[in-house]
Amino acid sequence: MITSLERFTNLGPSSINDLEMERDFIRDTLEVLRATGEISNDAFLDAGTIQGGLSLLLNLLTQGITEAEASLQLNSLKERAGSLSRTYPDLDSKVESMRK
């Protein structure tokens, strides 16, 4: 999941579409990985915080927060994704393997 977030550096109104696509990719991928038993329910629920964080970030961007505020939110999500990578070492590679 950290790989997904590392794609984003500067956020602003022009990045809303890309963030929406990434959020949807993460949501759909996590559902498939859980349904096929490739990740545990705990990993699914914990990783859902990244999807939720992206949704929050999207809402804030549409409300016009500054790029600095958006960067703070993104950095917080990256820290959470790093923690997830330590807890579930294979999660990032499993998510990325689903990318077309």
Which residues are covered by each model-predicted region?
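Short terminal alpha-helical segments
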Residues: 1-36
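Exposed, low-complexity/repetitive linear segments and helix-based recognition motifs
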Residues: 3, 17-19, 25, 43, ...
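Short, flexible coil/linker elements and helix-boundary hinge sites characteristic
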Residues: 10, 37, 63, 88-89
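Charged, amphipathic alpha-helical oligomerization/scaffolding segments
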Residues: 14, 18-21, 25-28, 49, ...
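Amphipathic, soluble alpha-helical interaction motifs
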Residues: 29-32, 36, 57-60, 87, ...
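Amphipathic protein-protein interaction modules
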Residues: 40-79
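Amphipathic alpha-helical binding modules
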Residues: 65-100
